[in-house]
Amino acid sequence: MLPNLVILDVTEPRKPSSSAGIRQLTADQIQMLRAFIQKRVKNADDVDDILQCVFLEALRNEHKFQHASKPQTWLCGIALNLIRNHFRKMYRQPYQESWEDDVHTDLEWHGDITHQVDGHRQLARVIEAIDCLPTNMQKVLEVSLEMDGNYQETANTLGVPIGTVRSRLSRARVQLKQQIDPFA
């Protein structure tokens, strides 16, 4: 387990009494804060990033701490705000698989020609399905891919509201799934 952790301050604290609770946390308190974040965020790397940001925000704003609550409660409030911001950011830019992930999979199957043939057939079905989409959906899909999936940049490029981009992409996904695999 982690030993008791004391965050050292190399500068003079603004109020010596106000920073004591925030700057001195035990391993149990840090673990409780980590558990608070883990309940809401499942990705371990994101949990670590958010936890680190909580401490940075707390140190940056320690002069605003009023002692109306426990330092742990104040830190949980900061964590909750950062978690909300994290999910807002994720909503604006959806997850996309990288092509590098496919390279590793292809290397594992390099001796199996049937896998390559199936991949080419599936790619052909996807291209055919995209060609069957209405022009406005094709354009939104194309620009979205060029903008790395960023809805706002796609909307700005096309000169349409962000809601229109989301709607067209959603309908395009549904149509593509139905055309590629009607039994799914």
UniProtKB/Swiss-Prot annotation:
An example molecular function term from Gene Ontology annotations: DNA binding
Alphabetical list of SUPFAM superfamilies matching this protein: Sigma2 domain of RNA polymerase sigma factors, Sigma3 and sigma4 domains of RNA polymerase sigma factors
Keywords: DNA-binding, Hypersensitive response elicitation, Sigma factor, Transcription, Transcription regulation
Sequence motif Polymerase core binding, residues: 49-62
One Pfam family this sequence matches: Sigma70_r4
Gene Ontology biological-process annotations: DNA-templated transcription initiation; symbiont-mediated perturbation of host programmed cell death
InterPro entries the UniProt entry points to: RNA_pol_sigma-70-like, RNA_pol_sigma-70_dom, RNA_pol_sigma70_ECF_CS, RNA_pol_sigma70_r2, RNA_pol_sigma70_r4, RNA_pol_sigma_r2, RNA_pol_sigma_r3/r4-like, WH-like_DNA-bd_sf
Coiled coil ranges: none
Start-end of DNA-binding region: 151-170
Function: Sigma factors are initiation factors that promote the attachment of RNA polymerase to specific initiation sites and are then released. This sigma factor is involved in the activation of hprD as well as other hrp loci which are involved in plant pathogenicity, hrmA and avr genes.
Family: Belongs to the sigma-70 factor family. ECF subfamily.
Protein name: RNA polymerase sigma factor HrpL
Upper lineage: Bacteria, Pseudomonadati, Pseudomonadota, Gammaproteobacteria, Pseudomonadales
Gene that this sequence comes from: hrpL
